[in-house]
Amino acid sequence: MIQLYNSMTGKKEPFKPLEEGKVKMYVCGPTVYNYIHIGNARPAIVFDTVRRYFTYRGYDVKYVSNFTDVDDKIIRTANELGEDYHALTKRFIEAYHADTGALNVQKADIHPLVTETMDDIIAFIEVLVKKGNAYASSGDVYFRTRSFKDYGQLSQQSIDELRSGARIEVGEKKEDPLDFVLWKAAKPGEPAWTSPWGEGRPGWHIECSAMAKKYLGDTIDIHAGGQDLKFPHHENEIAQSEACNSQKFANYWMHNGFLNIENEKMSKSLGNFLTVHEAIQAVDPMVLRFFMLSVQYRHPINYSRDLIDQAANGLARIRESVANVEHRLTMTADLGTATEKWLNRIEEIKQHFVTSMDDDFNTANAVTDLFDLSKEANLYLGEDQVAKEVLERFLAVFQELSTVLGVTLTIEKGLLDEEVEQLIRDRDTARKERDFARADAIRDQLRDQGILLEDTAQGMRWKRG
C-alpha cells in the first residue's frame, strides 16, 4: 500500500482515495511572466513522478495544474516590455510547456487559466460574502480570517501568533490585519472584470480554490506544491474552500523541499538565478531530472556543478548497461538457457523499487534500485553464456522502472552496431595481415567512440563503456 507524508498531520499515512481506484490531484502551477527557474522545476518533476507512480499502481489519476495568467507581476512586466499581458502570458505558457516537456514532465489533464475561470471565481466569492466569511470594502473583497476557526492548522500557527506579526498596509481597508484579499478593485490601465463589487480582478489565493472546485469537486485527494506555498497560500486556500463548501478541502497535502544553488538560496541579487531554459542548454534535461529524483522530495536539494556531474556520470553508467544488454541480444551465437537465479534477482530489484516508491515516493531509494539493476546486468554480461530470456527481462524492467521515474535510458550511440562490427572485422583482417599500425588506429577509433574490446573463449566481444 502507498504511504505518503501528509503535511497537515505531519506523519506518513496510508493512501485511501475518495473513490476506489481514482486519484484527484491539484498542483499549484506558475505565474507566467518569465521562464521558470530550476526551483520551479522541482515540483513539476516531483509531482509528475507521483502521478506516474499512481498510474503504474493502477490508479486513474485526474491531474490539474493551473497557470496564473493575470497578477501584479504580469501586469508590471508587460508594461515594462510594452507588451499586451495576454501575449506575454501566452508566450511564457508555451515556454513552460517546452521546458517541462524537455524534462519529460507530462502535461496535466487540465491546465486552467485564471482569465478563463473568472465567472467561477466571482461565484465562489459571492458564496463567501453571503455566508459572512467575506466582506466588501470600497470595491475590494476580503476574507474574514477569524471566521474560520481552524485557520493556521496546516502551518501549525495560532491566530494569536499570526496576529502579532500582521499589519494593515496603506490603502487596505480591512476589518482585521489577518484578513486577506479575494477581489481587488480595478486600477487605471489594468485589466479588470465586472463583478457585484465593481470592476476588478481576483486575489491570488482564491484562484486555486475556485479552479480546484470547478475541475475536481469540493473535496480532493491530494493538493501539492512547493514548501514555500504552505503559508499563506495553501492555508488561505483551506480557509476559503472549507468556508465555502462546508467540507474538507483536501485529504492529503504534499510539499516538496527547497532547492539551493551552491548551498545558497537562489536570488537575482546573488547572481545565481538559473532558469530551466538556461540550464538545459548546458545539461542534458534527463540528467537534470535524474538529479532532482536522487533526493527524497521532502528534503532540501543543493544544485551544484559537482552534483550535476555526478548525476550525469551515474545516468551514463545506467545507459551504458542498457546499451550493452541491447547489443548482447544481437550476438545470438553465445545465447544459452535462462537460469532462475538471474530472473529472481531481477524480480527482487523490481519489488524493492515498488517498496521504495510505496514509502512516500522515495525516489532516492528508487534511483539506487536502478543502479542495482545496472550492476546486476553488468555482472550477467560477464557470464560466458547468457540467455535471451534474461536479457529481455533486464531490458523490460529497465524500461518499466525508468518510465515510472520519467527518465529515458536511450542514448545517442554514435557508431551503429553494424558499423562497429565492420570495424572489428577490418581490425581483425589488419592483424592477420600484420598491419599493426592500421589495427591500432582502428582500436583507437573504437575507444574514442566508447567501444571496449575483450577477447573471450567464444571470440572477440565488444561493449559500450
From Swiss-Prot:
Major subcellular location class: cytoplasm
Quaternary data: Monomer.
Cofactor note: Binds 1 zinc ion per subunit.
Family named by the database record: Belongs to the class-I aminoacyl-tRNA synthetase family.
One Pfam family hit: tRNA-synt_1e
Keyword field: Aminoacyl-tRNA synthetase, ATP-binding, Cytoplasm, Ligase, Metal-binding, Nucleotide-binding, Protein biosynthesis, Zinc
Catalytic activity: tRNA(Cys) + L-cysteine + ATP = L-cysteinyl-tRNA(Cys) + AMP + diphosphate
Gene3D superfamilies reported in the protein's UniProt record: Cysteine-tRNA ligase, C-terminal anti-codon recognition domain, HUPs
Organism per entry: Exiguobacterium sibiricum (strain DSM 17290 / CCUG 55495 / CIP 109462 / JCM 13490 / 255-15)
GO CC annotations, alphabetized: cytosol
Alphabetized HAMAP family for the sequence: Cys_tRNA_synth (MF_00041)
GO MF entry, a single one: cysteine-tRNA ligase activity
Motif 'HIGH' region location, chain numbering: 30-40
GO BP term, example: cysteinyl-tRNA aminoacylation
Cofactor dependency: Zn(2+)
Chain residues that bind Zn(2+): C28, C208, H233, E237
EC number: 6.1.1.16
Residue positions binding ATP: K268
Localisation per UniProt entry: Cytoplasm
Motif 'KMSKS' region, residue numbers: 265-269
Protein's UniProt name: Cysteine--tRNA ligase
Enzyme class: ligase
